[in-house]
Amino acid sequence: MLINKLLLKLNKQERKAIKEFKIRLRKELGEQVVEIKLFGSKARGDSHEESDIDILVVLRADSEENKDKIFDIVQNILLEYEVLLSPIIFNKQEYDSLNSIPTIFMQNIKFEGVRI
């Protein structure tokens, strides 16, 4: 399974932080969460010690309240695990629309992104 191979490239704190982020996100936003993907250097396996962890979060509908909740979770993860998560947040409609445009950013998410 791809996720297992990916997780082996992450250190123990990073694995714990990602797992906890997913748990808290699902607890706080429940059915609003459509998809969570790891992408960027951590997903490619070419990160360095100072690399952050890029995470795509797709919500059914985004709002300032939902974004605030996500950033509160990220801040708490940083304090507890000393792991910097960098979420990119889209609503489902934005994500689908952007997916139809062949930008480098969206191509990277499509090809290197790993669902968590």
Label for each model-derived stretch:
Residues 1-34, 44-49, 59-116:
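Catalytic core of pol beta-like nucleotidyltransferases
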